[in-house]
Amino acid sequence: MEDSNMLPQFIHGILSTSHSLFPRSIQELDEGATTPYDYDDGEPCHKTSVKQIGAWILPPLYSLVFIFGFVGNMLVIIILISCKKLKSMTDIYLFNLAISDLLFLLTLPFWAHYAANEWVFGNIMCKLFTGLYHIGYFGGIFFIILLTIDRYLAIVHAVFALKARTVTFGVITSVVTWVVAVFASLPGIIFTKSEQEDDQHTCGPYFPTIWKNFQTIMRNILSLILPLLVMVICYSGILHTLFRCRNEKKRHRAVRLIFAIMIVYFLFWTPYNIVLFLTTFQEFLGMSNCVVDMHLDQAMQVTETLGMTHCCVNPIIYAFVGEKFRRYLSIFFRKHIAKNLCKQCPVFYRETADRVSSTFTPSTGEQEVSVGL
């Protein structure tokens, strides 16, 4: 008789839990959220220590992520615009990926302040930064998927890619991707608001039960299942094609890149997904007690922060692995940064000019930079 009730309990465990993309310190508080008296012993579950740890750790971590991520993604945008001129579909996707990361990063200083204090920016700013956070988050995932498909077409279906991989098609798919990212973010924006609780203002989502369930399922599908399926399918085809390629150097270079993409992605996001899984099935797995809940709160803060640092790695993985791109970056610093720091070095600038003219041509430069992804 007990076994017959397992499936309904399992389904209920899936649909009765929701998780925010925000840190646990600003987790959603709705009618279905855990209260201090929800546990069997009737004793309150005080999470003061969890909040204190978050107040100490999250602000400096978010600040570092913001600084390194902002600088890295701005460099990607500058190089793509000034050197590459956005002449290929890969460039378009790289540009939009950097924009997604920047939208995501722009909210981090405010979440850093909120982790250490109350929310002081009002309801409108609460919705605005929530929207930027979600749009940047989903946009980043979607453009990683597009970049993966772009590499798949370029390597596995090279003839078809000559017609399909155009700048126009890249712009169209990018616009559609942004629209989808906005729609995916709407539930979080609509149901997020600033409230006053216990003499402090908070900013977080207040989902009705139905929308909470929908948001949880949609987020798991779009941010975990879909990208994993695309990566497995596309990179399996890419590896199969590359292992038949006679160009050993090109093959090994592409394999190293694919290996780096997959390893870094799983390294930064697998811990968060594991903690998210445990939290989702917390009641079903018999872990619904205060001690476990506090440990999961702490783990969620740490692993989600680790996942957010992935936006700092994107410029390295998707741009700077190309040798020509690194040379573009070196020349950019020599030509623009060093020019302001050392105006009395004519020999230095002649060397830079020679490198620019001899190393890069419109034909080879554009082709080699795209090899980075």
UniProtKB/Swiss-Prot annotation:
Q: Which residues carry this modification: Phosphotyrosine?
A: Y152
Q: Membrane spanning segments where? A: 61-81, 92-112, 129-149, 171-191, 221-241, 257-277, 302-322
Example GO biological process term?
regulation of T cell differentiation
Disulfide bonding pattern of the chain:
C126-C203
Query: Which positions make up the signal peptide?
Result: none
Record's keyword terms, sorted: Cell membrane, Disulfide bond, G-protein coupled receptor, Glycoprotein, Inflammatory response, Membrane, Phosphoprotein, Receptor, Transducer, Transmembrane, Transmembrane helix
Which Gene Ontology cellular component terms are annotated? cytoplasm; dendrite; external side of plasma membrane; neuronal cell body; perikaryon; perinuclear region of cytoplasm; plasma membrane; primary dendrite
Q: Which InterPro entries match?
A: CCR1-9-like (IPR050119), Chemokine_CCR2 (IPR002237), Chemokine_rcpt (IPR000355), GPCR_Rhodpsn (IPR000276), GPCR_Rhodpsn_7TM (IPR017452)
Let me know which tissues express this protein, per UniProt.
Answer: Expressed in lung, spleen, kidney, thymus and macrophages.
Membrane-side (Cytoplasmic) residue stretches: 82-91, 150-170, 242-256, 323-373
For this UniProt entry, what is the primary localization, expressed as one broad class? membrane
Enumerate the GO terms in the molecular function aspect. Answer: C-C chemokine receptor activity; CCR2 chemokine receptor binding; chemokine (C-C motif) ligand 12 binding; chemokine (C-C motif) ligand 2 binding; chemokine (C-C motif) ligand 5 binding; chemokine (C-C motif) ligand 7 binding; cytokine binding; identical protein binding
Family, similarity comment: Belongs to the G-protein coupled receptor 1 family.
How does this protein assemble?
A: Interacts with ARRB1. Interacts (via extracellular N-terminal region) with beta-defensin DEFB106A/DEFB106B; this interaction may preferentially require specific tyrosine sulfation on CCR2. Interacts with NUP85; the interaction is required for CCR2 clusters formation on the cell membrane and CCR2 signaling.
Report what the protein is called.
C-C chemokine receptor type 2
The record lists the organism as Rattus norvegicus (Rat)
Q: What would be the name of the gene that encodes this protein?
A: Ccr2
